[in-house]
Every structure is written in C-alpha cells, then in structure tokens.
Amino acid sequence: RSAFRLVLEYDGSRYMGWQRQGEGQTRAGVRTVAGTLERVLREAGLSVLTLGGSGRTDAGVHALGQVAHLHLGPGAPSPKELRRLLDEGLPHDVALRELAPCGPAFHARHDARSRSYLYQLSLRRSALAKPYLWWVKGALDLARLEETWRLFEGFHDVSAFADLEREDPRCEVQACELAREGSLVLLRVTASHFLRRQVRRMVGAAVWCGLGRERPARVARDLARPSEAA
C-alpha cells in the first residue's frame, strides 16, 4: 500500500463537483473530478484503495489547489512514474500541480486547518474570462459590498445561507477579504469548512446589498436569528 498527497487544479465547468457519485458516473452523465481521476488510475492498471479530497465542491466550481490523498495497492509506481501517468491521462481541464509520497495517516479533509474560496466579480463584460467571472451589471457600491461581506466573519449559524444535509449549521469564518484590481473585485473567504452552496449565497447576499437591493442589516439579522430568515 502506497500513500500520496496530491494538489490538483481544475476547471469545473464540465463537472458535478469533486465528489465521486457512484458506479457508472460517466455513462450516466454524472462527471466528477474524483471520478475522472480514479478512472484514469484504474485504466492505467492501478489498484485504487482510497481517494479523498479536502472538501466537496459544488457543480461548476473551479479549483486552484484542491488537496487530495491517494492510497494505491500493491504494484504502485514511483512518484515520478505516477505523475507521468496522470499528466498523460487526465483531460485538458484537470491538472496535477503537486504529487509527493505521504504517511498513510494523512487525510486531506481531516488534516485541513482551513479552506479558501475566491470569487471574481467583473464590473464590465469580458469575452475571454467569462467562465471565471460574475459580470455584475449595475452600479455596485463597493463600500456597502465590503461592509456586508465582512459581516460573515466569525462563528455563525449559517442556516440561512446554505443547503443543509443533517450537518451542524455552525461555521467559523476566519476571514472575508475584498480587493479591487482594475475592473475586477475579488472576494476571498477562509473558513474551517463550508456547507453546500454557502459561499455562493454569501457572495450573492453581499452583491445584492452592494447594488442597493437589500440592506446589510438584513444579512446581520439572518446570521443572528437564522430561524427567522425568509
């Protein structure tokens, strides 16, 4: 049994997130990043014992550095050969950034201290970067946007901003940052973990306030009293 730590970059446009969705996922039209990676490994004749990521991503979400752990059975290749197999076998929208042997106890999700998401808002229409931007039409008040964005910092019950599946709705958001680069507004959030669709809804709420269609006080109320959120 051989263990490896991987760091992957991918364009999530064609994928239903990271997590494998069961047998026959490609035939059923349900393509995931983990399922694609596992298929490439098995087609190379390798025995995949365990493959796990640092977190699930929603459909269509891209990754700059998704950490994963991989356990292979007997006959596993050297790290150099494994990298060659993946570089040659992975599709154009999935790239292996790093690969290194690791201890068998390493777990990408359990050992992660935090996770970060980056949202790119564009104040103008873009022809080339369209898949990676949200073109926000209308006058965006950046001060109001940032005021709302920073409300999410801290330990909150985020029930009003996520789809829950029996999880604990509480989440520690360590930092919400905003930066302006030309026509781009970059929203970065770092947290202990994220719930399903949480980041999208946080960004949506902040943008809605920045456009003047909602008040930051409403977001603060939904964080303080999520049971009253409409």
Protein language model regions, located:
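Structured-RNA-binding interfaces characteristic of tRNA pseudouridine synthases
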Residues: 1-230
